[in-house]
Regions:
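Short loop/turn motifs at secondary-structure junctions
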Residues: 86, 120-123, 149, 221-224, ...
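Beta/alpha (TIM)-barrel catalytic core signal, keyed to glycine-rich beta->alpha loops juxtaposed to Asp/Glu
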Residues: 57-75, 108, 132, 214, ...
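Short, acidic/polar
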Residues: 103-116, 205-219, 270-278
Length: 337
């Protein structure tokens, strides 16, 4: 990516990071992941075009040096030894489009997507969680405004949270399923621009995944997305619901029977839960894994996941290789100050 612009830190402020340092960090990070890939051997390649954050084999992610600091990651796929990464290997992570940590605007979101498209990036990763649907809306609007060629553009989104109008949420859901920490006004909410008329309801069941998928298509205003990632199934209740509750099976059905998606994926931070999910489901269940913040210069907890994915032929989209911006002058690590 261009070293002519300063990398934007996680708090949505332009940091005075020296361009040369940003470039060096990117090269170091990519070299680390290339070394792992060449030692392990080639994995499976994601179906054409398209880290987010930032799938198939070991991926390396780095921050897009635009004013918005949307994150990106690269998939090494089954590249032969000596094959250099290109812009085609990058995925733009779209949580910053919703204004993570600080308020942003639709115009900034469009500028970010336009810069990515101009650079040749054609793959985008978003989620309902990012601004309670705001990232999806802004991404869809930006792709249309920028005239993106959707025949060459791939979009990934996530399932596990259903965004419901407040008047639709039941008393029982408010008691046990609403993720209150992600509602505007709560000190834990990191998306200040999120709408105030919806609530995030945790739902990792098959019907919940199906509704989340349909709602995402409506917000994006797209006929389809390429991949659905199970998002943050990192406690025992969510994990059990995704498996025993039929969530994983529903995604496989959407891919294999209905041809509604091309990839069944994971979008998680905890490497231990990623590996459990892989091991507790049959080979061929997952096409890719997005693992955030678990394989970078500060944290290598995800090493075992990389080897397990290599063994199974599962692509890895490695997100957060700059440790939530901490390695490039930011003030957050693992999404916390």
């Amino acid at each position: 990516m261009s070293a002519r612009r300063s990398t934007r830190a996680s708090n949505d402020r332009v940091e005075s990071l020296a361009p040369n340092l940003a470039h060096v960090l990117a090269v170091i990070a990519l070299a680390v992941f290339a070394a792992i890939h060449f030692r392990a051997g080639a994995g499976r390649v994601a179906p054409s075009s398209g880290d987010a954050s930032d799938s198939k084999s070991v991926s390396a992610g780095f921050a897009i040096p635009t004013e918005k600091m949307a994150s990106a990651s690269a998939s090494l796929g089954s590249h032969p030894a000596g094959r250099k990464l290109t812009v085609d290997d990058l995925i733009l992570g779209c949580s910053p489009l919703a204004g993570i940590y600080a308020s942003s605007t639709p115009e900034r979101a469009t500028e970010t997507v336009r810069a990515a498209l101009d650079a040749g990036i054609t793959r985008f990763d978003t989620a309902p969680h990012y601004g309670l649907g705001l990232s999806e809306r802004r991404l869809g609007d930006a792709l249309r405004e920028c005239g993106a060629d959707m025949s060459k553009t791939r979009v990934y989104t996530k399932v596990g949270r259903v965004m419901k109008p407040k008047d639709e949420v039941t008393a029982s859901e408010k008691e046990s399923a609403v993720e209150w920490g992600n509602v505007p006004g709560d000190p834990g909410c990191i998306f200040p621009d999120a709408p105030v008329d919806v609530l995030p309801v945790l739902d990792y069941t098959g019907p919940g995944f199906r509704r989340s998928h349909a709602d995402s298509l409506a917000r994006l205003r797209l006929g389809s997305v390429d991949g659905l990632r199970i998002h943050d199934a990192e406690d025992e209740a969510r994990y059990a619901q995704a498996n025993a509750g039929g969530g994983v099976a529903e995604l496989v059905k959407l891919r294999d029977d209905e041809r509604a998606i091309r990839e069944v994926s994971l979008g998680m931070n905890d490497a231990a839960f990623v590996r459990r999910m892989l091991e507790d489901n049959p080979p061929g269940t997952f096409d890719s894994v997005m693992m955030a913040g678990a394989w970078n210069l500060l944290d290598q907890d995800g090493g075992d996941v990389l080897w397990e994915c290599e063994r199974r032929g599962v692509a890895v989209h490695n997100a957060g290789i700059f440790a939530s911006g901490l390695l490039v002058g930011g003030s957050h690590y693992k999404y916390a100050p």
